Amino acid sequence: MARVKRAVNAHKKRRVVLERASGYRGQRSRLYRKAKEQLLHSFTYNFRDRKARKGDFRKLWIQRINAAVRAEGITYNRFIQGLHLAGIELDRRALAELAVSDPEAFKAIVEQAKAALPADVNAPKEA
């Protein structure tokens, strides 16, 4: 049986690892063993942060909606309650986009949500 020489495969494997680690600082971009270890950590961070990014965007959308509805004189949670009662099924991503790009349409949605809300139970009683 012929002898199998693995130098070509080994060099290719190392080259690929070092190419993927090219943006790292110091030894992590130049030494194979350090680069390989850093790549393993990077994959872990990447997996974790792909999940976290979804929550980050949701927080951003909520902040944008909250700022826009407070300008209309209503709080975020009352606005969401009003949307639910009015039967408007827009997600937070679409609402945030409307608040930024089309304030007039967003204002109309806020008015519909306000109209669907019951009377404020925490308002001071009129004498």
Curated annotation (Swiss-Prot):
Keywords: Ribonucleoprotein, Ribosomal protein, RNA-binding, rRNA-binding. SUPFAM superfamilies: Ribosomal protein L20. One of its GO terms (cellular component) is ribosome. GO terms for molecular function: rRNA binding; structural constituent of ribosome. PROSITE patterns: RIBOSOMAL_L20 (PS00937). InterPro entries: Ribosomal_bL20 (IPR005813), RIBOSOMAL_L20_CS (IPR049946), Ribosomal_protein_bL20_C (IPR035566). It comes from the Bacteria. GO terms for biological process: ribosomal large subunit assembly; translation. HAMAP family: Ribosomal_bL20. Binds directly to 23S ribosomal RNA and is necessary for the in vitro assembly process of the 50S ribosomal subunit. It is not involved in the protein synthesizing functions of that subunit. Belongs to the bacterial ribosomal protein bL20 family. This is Large ribosomal subunit protein bL20. It comes from Bifidobacterium adolescentis (strain ATCC 15703 / DSM 20083 / NCTC 11814 / E194a).
